[in-house]
Amino acid sequence: MQTILSFLSSLSERIGRALRSMLRLPSLPAGDLLHDRNYRRIFASVIITHFGAQITMLALPLTAATVLNATPTQMGFLMAAEIVPFVLLSLPAGVWLDRVRKLPVYVVGESVFALTLATVPIAAWTGVLSMTWLYVVGFVLGCVHVFGGTAAQIVLTQIVSRERLVEAHSKNALAVSGSEIAGPGLAGALIKLLGAPIAIAFDALL
């Protein structure tokens, strides 16, 4: 287990270095928004978050199906657990975020997201993983998406000037599209190589 975690940590560090190197390419036009260090961090976060989401999107239900032999009904409940927070909390989250600082919410959300994901491979390794566990994980991840995702959008408007918001949103959309195109294939290979629960650990490290 320690060897696998060391491998995942090393791999995530290499991906991070490659991404940082890519974002420092001298070929960028002089006025490109990526020259802004604060925006670069947001942009890198978008790529990493959405690539990791492709892993979890495949690995979480596969963990339920292959490790816990989940029934179709249980798989439906797992999907519902991730969706319910959007239905119940979207409006309250918006009202609450109007009254608090957004960046700490985003940072805490990312930390909770990583810690929640990390419980899945640990629970699988120790033999205590259950469908109830996965339901809770799915619900917490959904809550993080509601609060953290909304906060991230607001943080972007605070970092980037109004005149450059269209450019920022365009770049972010491109990053999301690229992650969604390349992510599933890479996620599938990672799951096949390491197994679904350990692949989730990789997303947690990202």
Question: What positions do the PLM features span?
Answer:
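Alpha-helical transmembrane-bundle signature of multi-pass membrane transport and export proteins
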Residues: Q2-L206
